[in-house]
Every structure is written in structure tokens, then in C-alpha cells.
A protein has these predicted regions:
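Phosphate-binding loop of NTP-binding sites
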Residues: 19, 23, 57-58, 70, ...
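Adenine nucleotide phosphate-binding catalytic loops in nucleotide-utilizing enzymes
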Residues: 2, 6, 43, 69, ...
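Short, surface-exposed amphipathic charged segments that create phosphate/polyanion-binding patches used
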Residues: 63-68, 104-109, 146-149, 243-256
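Short beta-strand "acidic-cap" motif of Rossmann-like dinucleotide-binding folds
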Residues: 26-31, 133-135, 237
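Active-site core of PLP-dependent enzymes with the aminotransferase class I/II
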Residues: 8, 220-221
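Short alpha-helical patches at coil-to-helix transitions and adjacent helical residues
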Residues: 10-13, 118, 269-272
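Short, solvent-exposed loop/turn elements at beta->coil junctions and helix N-caps
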Residues: 54, 139, 240-242
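N-terminal leader/targeting and accessory segments in enzymes
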Residues: 1-91, 95, 260, 264-266, ...
Length: 297
């Protein structure tokens, strides 16, 4: 498969491009500016670029797909040519969905805590030798395989692209979802609080029938949104667990007694409770979870 990335300099985009390259796909890409670390990575991976800038000659009818970055402008010459040729143009989340549509998609959403929770989940799974695919906002944040059953996706609420302003997390159709928090910020992509909350309502309703959502019941907006949803899914609330503090150390109350943790913030303890629900749905039992969590920093 030949895939061209318009906006390869975006973190999500080059992570996805590298993951596809590792699978043996033919990858090319362009952007106005690449940071120095990315230039080094692209040289090491032999990703096809012509330097910085846009090159409409890269767009031809031999391409199987064009992936469009979230920050690419509507008059981009490569995008214009791809549209003229009638090529298949995908946003990042659309293309990621196509790559993972036969897997069990675990989507972690929320305004501020999704990345931390996704990191916890991936740490727990790796500690317990549970191999999964993933797509998160971090260096080397995308891994795709043919054999893994699960994929963990960090679901952002930013627009998918200039030609499709649907929020990214509407595209994934999760089997298993987590919603951590809803915090509206003035001056963002969404016009007002009501519109912002509506995007999360659509996300909850996009969970496949019979799927599940794990949600933070201590966030009033999240709680009301999830509990009022008529989508026929299972709903698992979580909250800050019971814990003790002694000599600067946090001890979590567990069925097997107090367990020392490396984390200490109440927010992280609450995030841990959500991660536990997700990991249990992915085959990690309570004992395995707590053993791994004791090593998370």
C-alpha cells in the first residue's frame, strides 16, 4: 500500500507513518517544517521526503491513500491536487480506524487526564506481558500489528481536519471506552460549554452496542452525561479509592492490605481506579493490576 501524509510533521502523523513503515507499507510525506529530532527519525527510517515544503508532484494516481493532518490548510497544493485526482483522503482518526476496525478498540477520552490514564494502562499491560496495539500522544506513540486483538487509542476532541471538523474521537467507534473529565476552555476549538459537552455526548453514543464505558463519577458533567445516555452499553463508574498517607508515602487500601504506590496525587489515584476497570476488561486481574501499578511512576 502506498500512503502519502500531508502534514507529516504533526506528532500523531509521523507516529502513524512510522508504524505503517514498520509493517512494510510504502510511506511518503510532506510538511512546511520538520523539527530536528523528526528529521533524524525520518532519515533513520528512510521515509520519503523532499525536504521542507509542499510538493504537488508527490500526489499521483498510484497512491492508495492520502492522510491529511489536523493543521493542514484548505488551499494546500497537495490537498488540492489529491481532491482533483479523486484520491481517497482520510483524516488521521479515519485512517487509524481503517487500520484497527477488526480489533477491539479501547478509547480513552477526556479533556485533561486521558494521556495519563492511557500511559497507566499501557504500563500495566506491558508489565503483565499483554501485547496490544496502541495510538497515543507520545514519542513512538503508535504501534500496529496484524496479530494483536486490542488497540488502545487516546481519543482527542480536536477537529479531524480542515475538510472534516468532526472531533477525532467521534471516528473510532469504541468497543470499550473511558471518559475521565470534561473541562471547557474558552478560546478553544468549541464555541461554548454546551457545544463542547455535546461532542462528548456524541462520543458516548458512538460506543458500539453491547460495549462499555468506564466513567469518572466525581465529575458531575461526566456522570450526568453517561448516566443519561440511552445507548445500550455497560456503564462502570469509578472514583478516588481509599488510601492512607504515612511519612510521605501513599498506601492504597486493597483486599490484600495496604499497598505502597509511587504516585501520590489524588487525581492520579482516581485515574488509577479508571485504568483498573479498563485493564480488567482486557484480561488483567486485580492482583496483577496492583502488582504492576506499584511500579508506575
Amino acid at each position: 500500500m502506498q500512503v502519502h501524509f500531508i502534514g507529516l510533521g504533526e506528532v500523531q502523523m509521523y507516529n502513524l507513518a512510522i508504524a505503517l513503515h514498520k509493517k512494510g507499507e510504502a510511506i511518503s510525506g510532506s510538511d512546511e517544517v520538520f523539527d530536528e529530532s523528526l528529521k533524524t527519525i525520518m532519515q533513520e527510517k528512510r521515509l520519503s521526503t523532499e525536504g521542507e515544503g509542499w510538493f504537488s508532484e508527490k500526489i499521483n494516481d498510484q497512491l492508495d491513500a492520502v492522510v491529511l493532518g489536523a493543521t493542514v490548510k484548505e488551499d494546500n497544493p497537495e490537498l488540492v491536487k489529491a481532491q482533483k485526482l479523486g484520491l481517497q483522503i482520510f483524516s488521521y482518526p479515519e485512517f487509524l480506524y481503517e487500520q484497527t476496525k477488526y480489533k477491539t478498540r479501547v478509547v480513552i477520552a477526556g479533556s485533561k487526564q486521558k494521556n495519563k490514564i492511557a500511559s497507566m494502562i499501557l504500563h500495566i499491560l506491558e508489565y503483565n506481558d499483554v501485547a496490544v496495539d496502541y495510538a497515543v500522544a507520545s514519542p513512538n506513540g503508535v504501534h500496529l500489528s496484524e496479530e494483536n486483538d486490542f488497540v488502545v487509542i487516546e481519543g482527542g476532541d480536536i477537529p479531524s481536519s480542515i475538510i472534516d471538523t468532526t472531533p477525532q474521537f467521534h471516528k473510532y467507534q469504541p468497543n470499550i471506552a473511558l471518559l475521565s473529565d470534561i473541562e471547557f476552555q474558552q478560546g478553544g476549538f468549541h464555541s461554548n460549554f454546551e457545544n463542547y459537552v455535546e461532542q462528548y455526548r456524541i462520543f458516548v453514543d458512538s460506543i458500539v452496542k453491547g460495549g462499555s464505558i468506564t466513567y469518572n463519577e466525581e465529575d458531575g458533567t461526566v456522570k450526568q452525561l453517561v448516566e443519561s445516555s440511552e445507548n445500550p452499553i455497560r456503564k462502570f463508574p469509578y472514583a478516588t479509592p481509599e488510601y492512607q498517607e504515612a511519612d510521605g508515602q501513599v498506601f492504597l487500601d486493597t483486599p490484600d492490605g495496604e499497598m505502597p504506590l509511587e504516585i501520590s496525587e489524588a487525581t492520579d489515584l482516581r485515574n488509577m481506579a479508571g485504568a483498573k476497570w479498563i485493564c480488567q476488561q482486557m484480561g488483567v486481574d486485580e492482583v496483577e493490576f496492583y502488582e504492576a501499578m506499584a511500579t508506575f511512576t
